């Protein structure tokens, strides 16, 4: 196979992997790739996958049978723009502040969260009330939109004064407790609370 044909076949494989993950949420097997791109030998497919990995277009996990992840470079090669999630302002992790719903910018979506892309947003933390949970002042949290939570989960919640805060959630006998992860701070006790979402990720890099 000529280099041009080999490169074309590798892009065909890359496209098939992307489409399969996008459609069903997990990568194809090597035999599925064989059938899709009309190659009879699994060893030939393994060779193409190895070359895609060397080019930085694909990441393979040798400990798992079908753990294939297309890199941002790989998506660029396919002409696919990385998915992004909205950054919708600032939320307090100390004293609650008014929630900001305006979209300030967008942040590249981590590959492991792509299946939830439409349900995610990012907020910047101000304050130190969650430091014992490893959430520091200036961190960026990724939040999955949902209106329920289990006890002990870290949520973004609206208080009865229409303010947003990041705290650990507890539903108790006759009230809700929004518990800070800082031994010097008291919990917020509320008769009612509205949950905006659950914290599912954390980024410490500056996104500005």
Swiss-Prot record:
EC assignment: 3.4.21.88
Pfam families registered for this protein in UniProt: LexA_DNA_bind, Peptidase_S24
InterPro entries: ArsR-like_HTH, LexA, LexA-like, LexA/Signal_pep-like_sf, LexA_DNA-bd_dom, LexA_repressor, Peptidase_S24_LexA, Peptidase_S24_S26A/B/C
Residues annotated as the enzyme's active site: 129 (for autocatalytic cleavage activity), 167 (for autocatalytic cleavage activity)
Segments of the chain annotated as binding DNA: 30-50
Catalytically driven reaction(s): Hydrolysis of Ala-|-Gly bond in repressor LexA
This protein's UniProt keywords: Autocatalytic cleavage, DNA damage, DNA repair, DNA replication, DNA-binding, Hydrolase, Repressor, SOS response, Transcription, Transcription regulation
GO BP annotations, alphabetical order: DNA repair; DNA replication; negative regulation of DNA-templated transcription; proteolysis; SOS response
GO molecular function: DNA binding; serine-type endopeptidase activity
Site feature Cleavage, where: 93-94
Family: Belongs to the peptidase S24 family.
PANTHER family associated with the record: LEXA REPRESSOR, LEXA REPRESSOR-RELATED
Assembly and oligomerization: Homodimer.
Function noted in UniProt: Represses a number of genes involved in the response to DNA damage (SOS response), including recA and lexA. In the presence of single-stranded DNA, RecA interacts with LexA causing an autocatalytic cleavage which disrupts the DNA-binding part of LexA, leading to derepression of the SOS regulon and eventually DNA repair.
Protein name: LexA repressor
């Amino acid at each position: 196979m000529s280099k041009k044909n080999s490169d074309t076949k590798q892009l065909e494989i890359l496209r098939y992997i992307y489409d399969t993950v996008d459609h069903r949420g997990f990568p194809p097997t090597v035999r599925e790739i064989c059938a899709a791109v009309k190659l009879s030998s699994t060893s030939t497919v393994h060779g193409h996958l190895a070359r895609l990995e060397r080019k930085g277009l694909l990441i393979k996990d040798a400990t798992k049978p079908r753990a294939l992840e297309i890199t941002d470079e790989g998506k660029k090669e396919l002409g696919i723009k990385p998915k992004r999630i909205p950054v919708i302002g600032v939320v307090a992790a100390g004293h609650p502040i008014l929630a900001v719903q305006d979209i300030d910018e967008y942040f590249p979506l981590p590959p492991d969260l792509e299946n939830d892309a439409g349900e995610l947003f990012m907020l910047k933390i101000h304050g130190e009330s969650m430091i014992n949970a490893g959430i520091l002042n200036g961190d960026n949290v990724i939040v999955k939109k949902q209106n329920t939570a289990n006890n002990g989960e870290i949520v973004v919640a609206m208080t009865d004064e229409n303010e947003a805060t990041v705290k650990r959630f507890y539903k108790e006998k006759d009230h809700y407790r929004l518990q800070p992860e800082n031994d010097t701070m008291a919990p917020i006790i509320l008769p009612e609370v509205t949950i905006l979402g659950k914290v599912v990720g954390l980024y410490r890099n500056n996104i500005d």
